[in-house]
Amino acid sequence: MASFPSLDNDRLLRTARGEPTDCTPVWMMRQAGRYLPEYQAIRKEHSFFEVVETPELAAEVTIQPVERFSLDAAILFCDIMVVPEAMGLTVKMVSGQGPTFPKPLTTPDEMERLVEPDVESALGHVFEALTVTRHELAGRVPLIGFSGAPWTLMAYMVEGGGSKSYRAARRWLYRHPDASKALLQRTTDVIVEYLIRQVDAGAQMLQVFDSWAGLHTPENFRTFCLPYLAEIATRVKAAHPDVPLVIFAKGAHYALDALADTDYDVISLDSTMDPDAARDTVGDRAVLQGNLDPCALYAPPDVLRREVQHMLAGFGPHHHIGNLGHGMLPDHDPEHARVFVDAVHEHSRHMRTV
């Protein structure tokens, strides 16, 4: 592993390990990106995937919110679709639609189009971006790496793009359960190597995004999500036992107890999950992250501060990482993001004194 500057602010990592801190650490999913004018200026000159695939540009965009706000982490500017790309599928970023696959996997026979990638070669730009970013951060805050989860990536690979129901992908689970498991396992193997290499390249915490976990029945989650999520955590921890792992299984309320029994250190909650109930279920088995409604950032600052106080009261002063229940939205006012970040720090400090 490369040599990096020492870390000045380790509040996030200490919280993820269950250690006490002076206040609640905070970062925001999609904190780097479309709502920031400085990002928009870069996008006028470069396409989305050009930014992702150019380490210096990815590093610049990753650091932009750290320069602007008092965040406790940077998260690499990248995209979960780099894994399906590495496996041989073509991904296009279409304005107004997001990622699309011109040739999705419509039948199990089409899995023959997939390749077993040389992860180091196929995703080398990601690893280089992590290394460049880690050096440019100069120890200000830790750097988070991430990947999409096997089911969420499969949903896109089969559906061909975004969908409200992902019925084509879910149809696979019922019509082709064995092929679905084979696809999930192949994707899992790539993700594991990808995440391990991210740590080697400079990532100090890792998050797995299972954005469409909540589309499953509890039984299908246990069959088509949980085993692969658990395997990822176990295998990555075997390689890097000291690196905190976060799981974000959006919408899977019923899965909290099972996820708490895996090797993930942190469970990220979406905005529909009740922090008190989650704490009762999880106990001290995992730290919780989240979960302010992103739309609360549209509120006037005084209302937003009250929403933050309410969120923090639900989680309590310890074993909590402040975040949103999903990502920043393109039309968010950056100054309201500042209010959110500062309010988490200020009110959580106050909570520790009473």
Curated annotation (Swiss-Prot):
Binding site for substrate: 30-34, 49, 79, 156, 211, 326
Classification via InterPro entries: UROD/MetE-like_sf (IPR038071), Uroporphyrinogen_deCO2ase_HemE (IPR006361), Uroporphyrinogen_deCOase (IPR000257)
PROSITE patterns assigned: UROD_1, UROD_2
GO BP: any one term: protoporphyrinogen IX biosynthetic process
Localization of this protein: Cytoplasm
E.C. number: 4.1.1.37
Site (Transition state stabilizer) residue list: 79
Keyword field: Cytoplasm, Decarboxylase, Lyase, Porphyrin biosynthesis
Subunit structure: Homodimer.
HAMAP family for this protein: URO_D
Family: Belongs to the uroporphyrinogen decarboxylase family.
UniProt name for this protein: Uroporphyrinogen decarboxylase
Species the sequence originates in: Salinibacter ruber (strain DSM 13855 / M31)
UniProt lineage: Bacteria, Pseudomonadati, Rhodothermota, Rhodothermia, Rhodothermales
Gene, per the UniProt record: hemE
